[in-house]
Amino acid sequence: MENLNRKKAIKIELANPDTIRSWSHGEVLKPETINYKTLKAEKDGLFDERIFGPTKNYECVCGRYKKANPMNKGKKCEKCGVELTESIVRRERMGHIELEEPVTHIWMLKVAPYRIAAILDLKAKELEEVVYFVSHIVLEQGNQKHFVEKEVLDLGSSRITKTREKLQLTILDVIDLINDPNHRDTKKANRLLEELKNTAVPFSIDEATSLISKYTGAKFGIGARAVEYLLEKVDLTKEIEAIKIQLENSKKTPNERTKLLKRLETFDSLKRSKQRPEWMVMRVIPVIPPDIRPIIQLDGGRFTTSEINDLYRRIIIRNERLKKVKEMGAPSIIVNNEKRMLQEAVDALFDNERKPKPVQRKNKRPLKSLTSVLKGKQGRFRQNLLGKRVDYSARSVIAIGPDLKMYQAGLPREMAITLFKPFVIQWLQDHEYAENVKIAEKMLLQNDPKVWEALEQVIKDRPVLLNRAPTLHRLGIQAFEPKLVKGKAIRLHPLVTTAFNADFDGDQMAVHVPITKEAVAESRALMLGSSAILGPKDGKAIVTPGQDIILGNYYLTTEEKNAKGQGMIFSSLDEAFMAYDSGQIHLNSLIGIALSALPEQKFSDKNQRLNSYLLTTVGKLYFNQIFDDNFPWINSNNIWNAKEAVKEFIYYFSQDINNVIENIQVQQPIKKKELSLIIERYFETHGARKTAEMLDKMKDLGFSFSTKSGTTISAGDVVAFTHKYDEFKEADQKVEQITDFYNMGMLTNSEKKRRIIEVWSDVKDKIQDELATVLRKDVKNPIFVMVDSGARGNISNFTQLVGMRGLMNDTKGDIKEIPIKSSFREGLTVSEYFVSTHGARKGMADIALKTADSGYLTRRLVDVSQEIVVVNEDCEPSKGFEVSAIIDTKHDNVIVPLKDRLVGRFTFEDIYDDDKNLVAFANTLIDKNIAEKIIMSGISSVVIRSVLTCDNKRGVCQKCYGLNLATASVVNIGEPVGVIAAQSIGEPGTQLTMRNFHTGGVAGNVDITQGLPRIKELLDVTTPKGAVAIISEVDGVVSEIEDYNGVFVINIVTENEEVKKYKTEFNSVLRVEQGSSVVAGQKLTEGAIDLHQLLEFGGIQDVQNYILKEVQKVYRLQGIEISDKYIEIIIKQMLNKVKITDGGDSDLLPGEVITIQNYKEVVQDCIVKSIRPPLSKAQIFGIKKAPLESSSWLSSASFQDTARVLTRAIIKGKEDKLEGLKENIMLGNLIPAGTGLTGTQEVEQLAEQYHNNEY
């Protein structure tokens, strides 16, 4: 059913005085708020009940209507005039203030691009001087020739002499016009002339201008009234025509053209939106409803009030004072001063912070004006509209819940009873334990046993949502079925901690209760903890077991020769388990089990079943119990080919088991990597729910056997290692030699440093290798077990424990040349400890900075891509996107192999190998097998479907997007892929380094920024720091390279025999040599490319490929895998606008920025009508700028630059069609994604199905 409350669009415009009066319920005349004795609102004041409505429902202010009676609705009290209605109207009824003098709106005057100045073609500074009563302006030229219309008479600066001269000349003309030396005005004119000639003598400008006006018809003005007069005279149509003629004049400089285009945009916007420029000057200002700016009584009888009330009071007081001053007939200087103060008071109300001297409180803090209420993190948009507080939520510390199933979370009983209170009360009433709500509440207070029964029943039907801040990706909120637990901590399943990035060292989590039927169904069908097996950023399992679970399964699958019970053969699983339970065999003993006792689906060869046994251990029997019968038997760490690998462990009964054991090598246990592979493979064959069930069994096994393994760690496990001192001796000699060379001047400082660092790095590597060998000999050493299994720690930690700590970083992040020779076991000396503090401290500071930086990056990414949603199945695009392996050309190593780029995408066209054999049809989903086939065929590049070439007007289609990595199936219609892309790029942001990796000044290498700063540089499209590459503007051949002492000049000859010269910076590293052929956009020197240049010379496709390659390079270097498609979505948003260079015969204006889709529509329309189509130029916007260019003004205003975005939207009279997610959230609509787009029917059926099954 269509939601009738759903708002379709929202429009913003300038309000004209009549509109403001029509909104108003009365004029506010007095600055009073409430009476200090009666605490009632003052009549005609800022809280007057006659204007804004009653403070209590259906009660008037005088007491005549005391009892709240809804029957009186709509009546007015005969005595005090208050309308009897609900008090809620005080949140919506507005008042107004009639201003004694017009004032300009500060946004239109002072927010760049200064709109009023643009309309009047004045400098913003001059216009401000007019508005604030510093300078006069010419309103009408009359029949004098010295002053032109709109000229500003500047009396405050160096231009005063010029103004004096012009006034003298004009007054001389006036004397000629009077033509009577004895006339009173002639004498006045002569006196003025004398005053004007002597620059030290002051003169009255008012006197001079009134005299000139009297005889020449010229008009002068000052203040907002003058501005209003000029704006009223503006004829929008004539102005537009005039500017178009000026633009055709080719002699204009680029700056002049830009200024003209800005003016043209303003005039055109006003004309199209049917608004008048004079509305930018206000004669009436609205007073917002009183409940939005309340006055609140504090304890002790004092009051606190919203600061907006103070700003309104100042306006009313000054307005009244201006009235009085006028009535008294005060001199113009006093009147003008009052007018200026009124203008400033209105400015303070609208945007106090923009004023040079904001109105301050006693504590020197500026008062919060209407603009400050809107903008920033604490503003209306971000604080109240995009994120709201909810009614049913709880928060507590989390603790591990090892006995929970993957779909469960433990809720403390007290927390649950409070959260589910309304449902418990309902249940008690339905089951007739309580007659009404009051009795039920009493039962709750008294802890009646029935209450707990009710709670147990209620929670069966309602999952809860658990959230851990910061919510960096969609798995930061998951749904669980609640299970009541004792204590006050929320219990969390150990395997979901990775997704939440939670640990149990005091982390807290929030609980939310889905209330409506649809919300409950969505939680169950889409968000249950047991369905979140894969991480969205790379499609790899995110629920990988860690620590004790790995340790337990490692111990379980270890094989040991000569252990108790070795060589026994069992006829059934139960027999083997009984033998283990009774202590006859060791868990890791090599034993045989009859093949007939095991499920036959697990083995490929059926014939051997009756006369063979499998060589294994009891541990592996337990381990294989957790998989179902269709999953191959795991007997070694060959997981991908397990069914074949198991064959080598099958022997005939005729072969003596003890001989067999003697002649074989023990198998490696199952480690962390193998467990991950098992989970991925299980997910592929069994789906999410079955995998969750298997994981729970794996967890139980892991915990159980890590306990039984009795792994401990003590100083005795840390082997002593004395061999290192020989290495140190040798290294010290080398260092001494290097220092001698340096002292003799044979090495530079940086070379010395580099060589010393190399010496110590080699020593540490040597010690590490030797230690690894020593450690491997003792297979049962608990430290080795932990490192080898992947449960905790690595060999480098062990090296620091017993070998040496090695080289440390200094505060800049560079490596120090003093090594730490001690290990932790020996203990560090004081100086060594001091050396190691720098790096550690920098690490902590970096993490804090990085978290904030990475969070802000995510916010900007979400803002740029939030409107992208999957809207249909196939857009049938005209072109595809060619991909090949991403290779770092400098070091010639593969960054992203082709296979990774193909899996999960659709082909665009049929793919053939070199022998013209068909490998894959067009529009086929490429899975691992097809990708493997493509690679084996020797194909190096493939044209695939991509979001970059998707032809949808809004959003993308299923085939251009491909697989949803979180579910490993084709993406659903309604999936908000833009937000997921932003989260997938932003979430690993905290793992990126803050460091710009510099090469420490080593010759021949170019400094390249990396880590988070490089990502920001690419996505914000800023000029790269460090070396900027020179790129070729033309196709051609390098004819010669001239070398002028390290500065090169590269000559490129084009096909037309033109020579293009490029001069490099000193000591640049060249990427071309003589005879190289180059294409436009190709690098000639090392360094980062400026994206604006690349777009201009190379084109859109080059930019797309470059950003994709560079972003992948940064993430892959840190070992983070991110799917191409996410980066493509962001690139699509950065490049989806064009700038009109020539409007042709369309309605588009030069300089206008529109989306490529809209541009294509206009062009097609022009072709159909046979008129000249517009011309355009591709644009690239960084992720800071792109959201501000969004078609939705609500979304842009809530991002950044609120005042500027709103001003622009107002001038255009923009209508927001509510197509993105943010704008719908703000208006309380369902978002146009997921079930908000497709309806909840399917999800409700799914939820019903899941509710009946366990997982």
UniProtKB/Swiss-Prot annotation:
GO terms for molecular function: DNA binding; DNA-directed RNA polymerase activity; magnesium ion binding; zinc ion binding. Pfam families: RNA_pol_Rpb1_1 (PF04997), RNA_pol_Rpb1_2 (PF00623), RNA_pol_Rpb1_3 (PF04983), RNA_pol_Rpb1_4 (PF05000), RNA_pol_Rpb1_5 (PF04998). Mg(2+) binds at residues 503, 505, 507. One of its GO terms (biological process) is DNA-templated transcription. It catalyses: RNA(n) + a ribonucleoside 5'-triphosphate = RNA(n+1) + diphosphate. Zn(2+) 1 binds at residues 60, 62, 77, 80. Gene3D superfamilies: 1.10.132.30, 1.10.150.390, 1.10.1790.20, 1.10.40.90, 2.40.40.20, 2.40.50.100, RNA polymerase II, clamp domain (4.10.860.120), RNA polymerase Rpb1, domain 3 (1.10.274.100). It is an enzyme of class 2 (transferase). Signal peptide: none annotated. InterPro entries: DNA-dir_RpoC_beta_prime, DNA-dir_RpoC_beta_prime_bact, RNA_pol_asu, RNA_pol_N, RNA_pol_Rpb1_1, RNA_pol_Rpb1_3, RNA_pol_Rpb1_3_sf, RNA_pol_Rpb1_4. Its cofactor is Mg(2+); Zn(2+). Binds 1 Mg(2+) ion per subunit. Binds 2 Zn(2+) ions per subunit. Zn(2+) 2 binds at residues 875, 950, 957, 960. Keywords: DNA-directed RNA polymerase, Magnesium, Metal-binding, Nucleotidyltransferase, Transcription, Transferase, Zinc. Its EC number is 2.7.7.6. GO terms for cellular component: DNA-directed RNA polymerase complex. Belongs to the RNA polymerase beta' chain family. DNA-dependent RNA polymerase catalyzes the transcription of DNA into RNA using the four ribonucleoside triphosphates as substrates. The RNAP catalytic core consists of 2 alpha, 1 beta, 1 beta' and 1 omega subunit. When a sigma factor is associated with the core the holoenzyme is formed, which can initiate transcription. This is DNA-directed RNA polymerase subunit beta'. It comes from Mycoplasma mycoides subsp. mycoides SC (strain CCUG 32753 / NCTC 10114 / PG1).
